[in-house]
Amino acid sequence: MGYLAAYGVVILLIIGIYSFGYAAKQTSLLTVVILETFFGLLLILPLLLFVNKIGFAQIFTLPTQQNWLWLGAAALMGFVLGNYFSLMHIRESGEKLNSLLSPAITALTIVLSYFLLNDKLAAYQWAGILLALITIVFFLLKQSNIHLQNQNFKGIYSGVATIICISFTIICTIKGVGDLPFLLAIWLRLFVAFILLLPPFIFSYKNKNLLPKNYLFYTIVFIGVLAQTIGAAYLWLYSSFHISVSVFQIILATLPLFMYAIDVYIFKKSKPSLYFLICAFVAAAGITLAML
């Protein structure tokens, strides 16, 4: 089941990337992020109350101070900053290129785990990490030449910011989950993120035109929340406890290849790119080496 969960994460991430990519092009990024957290809170709460049998008061008293601290940090780095920059990168560079950040996130997370979680790394694992990071950075630099010609820097710094924020989020989540039920850990991250996002959203809300009025937008956001915010997050935690972290990360490194096939041959949103495929394969090889 752990392997199925890992591939489920890949599938649900693809659905989430396209769903939130569509939403990010319809309204402000802040609106999409706060809707994601709001829908996530509403969807998970009944599951906590009626499936996990956790009382409403227990939702806030069951977590320890350490749970709140680390999951709160994960909320800030992930659901607030990470999601914001990821949506910006999707809007500026497209869904296919956004998926290529995944191996770099994995590589940086391994580096952070060495310093923050005291994980051991052999020389060949460091070589794999550097191979993955250098490949993605080189790809971003190549893309930067295109962006610089158009005086567009958002696609560059948003990609780098996404890698950094999501990597720290993973470390904070690992340290913050503890003995909490997976759904409760996800809900707490969403709750803290919603509290952090609400003041700037209210401040920026000048008129009702800020929120799209078509039902398709909200339906797609809802699908994205089910797929990525809840489904992928839950299966990620589940698979982390049922298969080795190395196997899971190797499976996750195939995300850009799946995205390439879907983006080019199914949705036909972008043209075939041998350079992208080479970068994706080399980055995946680097992650595989780092996880041996």
Predicted regions and their residues:
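Membrane-interface interhelical linkers
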Residues: 1-31, 35-73, 83-93, 141-160, ...
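MFS transmembrane alpha-helix packing/gate-lining sites
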Residues: 12, 78, 104-105, 165, ...
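Hydrophobic alpha-helical transmembrane segments in multi-pass integral membrane proteins
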Residues: 44-55, 108-121, 164-179, 227-241, ...
